[in-house]
Each structure stands twice: as C-alpha cells, then as structure tokens.
A protein has these predicted regions:
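Basic- and hydrophobic-enriched, low-structure N-terminal and domain-boundary segments
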Residues: 1-150, 154-162, 167-169, 496-497, ...
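Conserved long hydrophobic alpha-helices within structured protein cores
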Residues: 113, 119, 379-386, 479
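P-loop NTPase motor domains
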Residues: 24, 125, 132-436, 451, ...
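Short alpha-helical interface patches
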Residues: 49-53, 65-116, 220-230, 274-281, ...
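Conserved ATP-driven motor cores of ASCE-family P-loop NTPases powering translocation/secretion/packaging/pilus
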Residues: 428-529
Length: 603
C-alpha cells in the first residue's frame, strides 16, 4: 500500500463510528410510529429506545444511507472549518527571531575542548564531519567579517591555531599572515606540538622557503590551471591586453611554453626563469612572415619529433595570428611577467621546499606572508592556494579514498588581498568531503563581491558559520536583515484635554529588528554576532585568548616564546645539506697506492 493511501485511510478511520451512530438514528426514525414526518418525530424517542436496545449495526438500506450521508456531511464540515480556520501565532505575530542560548549550540559542540573550532567565548563547533546525529552535521567553512581593529587575528585566528593538539582530529593549517607577525607569535607552539612549519614570504624573500609551481604539474589540465591562475592575477600592459581576444591568445602562448618546459626541459630548468627566457627569445616581424625566432625553431624541431605534442598543438594555434598581432601579444606577455625580472623572485621560484602535496599527510603549518599595503606579488599566493586545493583534492581521491588523513584548515586572513583563486566558488562547495575547510576573513563583504562578482554569494552561502566582529553601513544592514524581527508589546498612554480631561491606554504588538542597524554599528567592542546554519543567532563575548590553556606558549604571554624564522630556516637548510639522499649517485674510484704513497697520505 502506498504511504499516501495509508495516511488517507488512517485519517478517515474515526468516521466509521459516525456511520454507525447516524445509521442507528436512521433506524430509530424508521422504527418510530407514524406515517408522516411530524408523527415520526413525535415518537422518535421510542424509536431510539428500540434501535439502541440492540448494539449490533443495522444493515437496512435506508439506515446505511443515513449513516454514510451523516458521516460524509460531518467530514465535509470538519474539512471546511479547517480550510477557513483563522491562524493565530500568539507572541510571534510580527516575527519569531530570538537570540540563541546554551541549549541551541549544545548539539554542535564536542565534549573534548581540543576537538572544536573556537567561534566565541561560549560557542564552538565540533571538528567531526560525521557526527552521530546527521542533523547536526555542519561544514567547517567560516566567514569572518570585521573592520580594522576588530580583533580578527586575536579573537579568531590565534585561538584556533592554539587548537593544534587534537588527537582525534589532527589538523594542518594554511595561514595567510599579513605583515608576517603571526608566525613569530605562534610558531614556537606549533613546533612543540609536532608540526612541520613552512613559510612563503613575499615581503622579504630572504626569509622564505622556495616555491616552484612547475613541481606540481602532473598533467595537461594542471598546465591549464596554472596558466588560468597566472592570467587572473596578473595584468598585461599592452594597449589591447584587456580585450578578450588578446587574453585568449596570450593564454595559448603561455600554455604552449609551460607545456614545453614541463614535458621537455630537464628538472633543474623547470621553473619561471626558463619561461621568462623563452618569452625574451620570442619575436615576431610584421614585414617578414618567414622569420623564425629561436623559440619558433624549438617548436618546429619538437613538431618533427612529435606532431601531436600538447605544447606543439597550442603553439600552432598561437601562430595562426599575424606578425603584428603576435608582437602585441608578446608585449603584453612581457609586461605580465615583469615581476620575474627581479632576481629575488626568480630565485624564490627556481626550486621547491613547500611540499604542498603532503600537507594533508602529516601535521603541517604553512604561513603565507604577504604585504597588507602592496599587492604586487600576491599573484604568487593565489597560485599557491589554487595549486594547493587542487593537489589536496586529487590526493584525497587518488590515494586516500576521498578523505585526507589530516584535516587541512585554510585560515585566510585578508582574503581579498590574496587575489582571485579560479573556480573558488565551486571548490569551496566540494572540499568538505575531502577533509578541507576554509575560514575566509574579510573587512567587508563588499571585498568578496569586488573580486568574485556574482560568485561571491555562492562562496558566502557555503560557509555554515558567519562570525561578525564589527562593521558599519551596508555590513550592519545586511546582518540586521538576516537576524530578522521579533514581536514586542507596545504600551501607549494618551491624554485628551478639553472641556473634560480624558485618559486612554492602548496595548498592541509590533515587529522590531532583533538588532537594528545602528545597534550593530555601536556594538560593544567585546561583543560579536555568530550565525550557524539552522540555529538561532548568538550575541556573545569574543573569545578571550588569555583563558586558553595553551596561551602561555605564545609570545604574547612570554617574549621568550618568539619564533625566529630566520634561525629556523638557516637550521633547516644546514640539516638538509648534511642529509644524503638514498637516490643520490656517486662515482667510485679504486686507486692502488704503494706503501710509500700511503705513508705520505697519512702524514
């Protein structure tokens, strides 16, 4: 039996009793003495006594018709009354918004303090992606909004980095560090907690590990992703560099060159230095269509050897343009690669020490240090983020059956300054199942819209937690609208003065924002608003890091805990120089020395 039919039968089953009762009344009317209606009604009581003397139902046709008709009429009355019933919601006539309390957040908190994401002083979210009750499952993506000085680092970033000792849910961190101060403050704690610490510094290249995106190219699609990230986050300066045709042509050029380097160059030449040299060696002449640059000759020889080569196919499409067009493309390409003319940048990206593909294998903290005033080198960070997410997703799928053994938390402070991560709106919707999460930290939601346009709303919708630390204007209005309205009681007192004085009292209900725009704009600096999907919002105290059990290991508590990045990198490189790889080969020479020669050597 279908569920709908079963539900219908159960709902109408009680009306069989009314079929019986109305049938008995029909039987009483039929058995009453008299030949017309008035006489029947006069003796109806006698008929009832006879009819109800026997409890068995009557199967007389007249009695059955009366029973069915009476029950049907009653069912129709109930149906009509239900349809036209007035709907009252007492106390919530204008809105049911309210602040959440301890009982609201309790199902989402892990009993073990270390197994939680710290959101406020009283609210936390378990790191468990598969809780016993699936209804309480939430992704670990957090959107943090707070203006300058609202404590985004102190009240959110640092408390969550101090959650680095969980044994049930080991976690790696990828942290953007504007100004480079955070690594010095928390680095010592991470080291003593068993973390590998990696650092990419785009402010001071001498205090950075090396990053080479070519080391993470494993297929043609990886080449396309790298080119796309480079195009999205750098600017060509040719007169037509912003036009779609020119960008597509430039994309073909980069794809061909990077594809050539990836598949044909020796390992030590797989870097941006080689790419820059190939661009510098490229040339197109409008007055000499037969002219061939050194790069043209390289691709011609490659085509003779392998006509179906990926790089050759891309370069042939690039050559379809006229000489003047190619000259414009080369100018734009040279301008886009201008940052690599700086020797320090080339040296930074000639080798790789970050080991991005292993961050989900063991506990690692990767600090991405960037300037908060200059975005010149932020395209490097965008490349790191883009490659990292794609590498971890592929590694989770190919090696670990879809889930990384170590959860990777990306805490992206000043997210708007990183640059655009291609397809981030799609990636953030799929990384949860791979044990990856992102905490997006902004000064205003308009920053997200400025970079990701229409995709900004998709990104924010995929964050199950929103933490609002402070804000004014449009930010405050958006938060106020999302919080909704509550129903309040209004009491008015009036007085009319004339020949006679009269007084009046008026009670009514009104709708009021749970927190108005001006209340949000003037919110106490120690307070914050937290929204968790499917839960009432919370108006709580910001997290006090001095009460965290591991606060004593930060340099905030004791200057002796300051982490010296320079010394750390120097020690790592010395250690690396002393280690001989098992794969390293040596030449062995067998020399036959005489006794006299041996004596001379010993002396």
């Amino acid at each position: 039996m279908k569920p709908e039919m079963k539900k219908l039968i159960i709902a109408n089953l009680p009306y069989l009793l009314f079929v019986y009762l109305f049938g008995k009344l029909g039987q009483a009317y039929r058995l009453a003495e008299g030949i017309d209606l008035s006489q029947k009604l006069l003796h109806f009581a006698d008929g009832c006594a006879v009819a109800f003397a026997n409890a068995a139902p009557s199967f007389n046709t007249f009695d059955l018709l009366i029973g069915v008709a009476g029950a049907a009429a009653l069912r129709l009355m109930v149906y009509c009354k239900g349809k036209n019933a007035k709907k009252y919601r007492k106390g919530v006539e204008y809105g049911s918004a309210r602040w959440g309390g301890p009982k609201d957040i309790a199902p989402y908190i892990d009993p073990n303090f270390d197994n939680n994401i710290l959101l406020t002083q009283t609210e936390r979210l378990t790191m468990n992606n598969r809780p016993k009750d699936p209804k309480t499952a939430r992704n670990k993506n957090v959107l943090v909004i707070g203006g300058s000085g609202s404590g985004k680092t102190r009240f959110f970033v640092k408390p969550n980095l101090m959650q680095c000792v969980s044994k049930d849910y080991p976690t790696s961190f990828v942290i953007t560090d504007p100004k480079g101060s955070l690594i010095g403050e928390v680095g010592q704690l991470l080291i003593r907690s068993g973390y590998r610490v990696k650092v990419l510094n785009t402010i001071n290249f001498s205090k950075s590990m090396k990053y080479n995106p070519f080391r993470y190219l494993h297929s043609e699609k990886d080449v396309l992703k790298l080119v796309n990230t480079l195009i999205c986050n750098t600017k060509g300066e040719g007169e037509k560099s912003a036009e779609d045709f020119w960008v597509k042509s430039e994309r073909l050029f980069y794809t061909a060159l990077i594809g050539y380097i990836w598949q044909e160059a020796p390992e030590e030449e797989m870097n941006f230095t080689t790419l820059l040299e190939m661009i510098n060696a490229s040339e197109a002449r409008e007055d000499d269509p037969e002219f061939q640059s050194p790069v043209d000759m390289m691709f011609e020889r490659l085509e003779e050897r392998d006509p179906d080569h990926f790089a050759v196919r891309q370069y042939k499409k690039f050559l379809l343009s006229a000489g003047k067009t190619r000259s414009s493309i080369l100018i734009s390409a040279g301008a886009r690669m201008a940052p690599f003319d700086i020797r320090e940048v080339r040296e930074l990206m000639e080798d790789d020490e970050l080991e991005l593909d292993t961050i989900g294998d063991e506990k690692t903290a990767l600090f991405l240090i960037m300037s908060d005033t200059d975005t010149t080198f932020n395209f490097i960070l965008a490349m790191v983020q883009s490659q990292l997410i794609n590498l971890l997703c592929d590694r989770a799928d190919d090696k670990y059956g879809g889930r990384l053994p170590v959860h990777v938390r990306m805490i992206l402070d000043e997210f708007a300054n990183i640059g655009q991560i291609p397809n981030f709106d799609k990636l953030i919707a799929t990384i949860r199942s791979r044990e990856i999460s992102a905490s997006i930290i902004l000064q205003s939601q308009s920053q997200l819209k400025a970079i990701y346009k229409d995709a900004a709303e998709i990104i924010s919708d995929n964050c199950d937690c929103t933490l609002f630390l402070s804000g004014r204007g449009k930010n405050a209005k958006e938060i106020s609208d999302v919080l909704g309205k509550e129903t309040i009681d209004s009491y008015n007192q009036s007085e009319n003065r004339g020949a006679q004085t009269s007084h009046g009292l008026n009670y009514q209900k009104l709708g009021k924002e749970l927190m108005s725009q001006d209340e949000i704009a003037t919110m106490d600096g120690g307070k914050c608003i937290l929204q968790v999907r499917g839960v009432r919002p919370f108006f709580s105290e910001k997290y006090d890091i001095t009460r965290h059990p591991r606060y004593k290991y930060l340099s905030d508590a004791d200057k002796k805990n300051y982490f010296d990045v320079d010394r750390y990198l120097t020690a790592l490189r010395r250690k690396r120089q002393r280690v001989v790889s098992q794969e390293e080969t040596f030449d062995l020479y067998d020399i036959d020395l005489s006794d006299e020669d041996m004596a001379a050597v010993n002396e």
